[in-house]
Amino acid sequence: MKLGVPLVCLLLLTTCCRFFKGDPYKNTPVSGTTTIAVDETFRPVFEAETALFQAIYGYSEIRTKYVPEKQAFKLLLDDSVKLIVASRQLHADEISTINSRKLFPKQLLVALDAIALIVHPSCKDSIISMKQIRELLGGKITDWEQLNSKNEKGTVRLLFDNEKSGIVAFLADSVCRGNFAVGRASALHNSREVIEYTATHPGVIGFVGTSWISNSNDSLHLSFHKKIKVLSVSEYDQPTPETSYKPYQAYLLDHRYPLTRSVYLINAEPRSGLSSGFVSFVSSDKGQRIILKSGILPAVAPARVVNIRPDL
């Protein structure tokens, strides 16, 4: 019986310590475990976001599923995850499905991304028009000579990361508006495979998210991976170097680069738990700086402190 009191005291002390230090088993905005689904085209950005979040909050564990965008929405609608990262917002019927479970999703714009067109470094073309892109995707243009009379004759092969990806959905819905000849295109498993294949196969045009090809060693984000060539895109039917733009952050901001899309965090968590905490982190100054460094455009410009010397 004499051991009872010390044992109770020890249990109370342990409980108090866990309360003050953070309970690793309790789901709060900064602790616990959650599973999220991220469109694979945003993987480089959110690998960095989750890594820093978990480094700061040691009792947090974010299990991330990098999947095609269609699968991410299915996981959310099936109640398998409470948070997804996607390039579009929920449709009305999808919101109704989630509402039927007494859940009310919040959708937050956190970044602007771009779809880059990449080719083999030996490709003679450097610019392409939106009209030509639509005709490529619609099957009207099938040969390199149709893009540029200086090109050697040969079939243009279109390459995507996955047939269910957000890139394919964006091109089909927002660019082609339904006139999308998917039979001519090839799909691999992920963006990394698209880059590797395009870098070693002339005659291919690959479609990838900009964060996959951004040169992390370039602090100004004015260059891309040297293993591939990035095409400049023009809104004009007769493109010129002066009217064509690469997916640099400045051209995402003013929408001069035409293939710009949004990045949303869609959170259906019933109360403020770890998923909600991660959403807050991504939209915070730290989270937005990670997005800025990745080569795409943060929705909120991170604060920048500048020291002004009085003697200047």
Q: Which positions does each model-derived feature cover?
A:
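Sec-dependent bacterial lipoprotein signal peptides
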Residues: 1-15
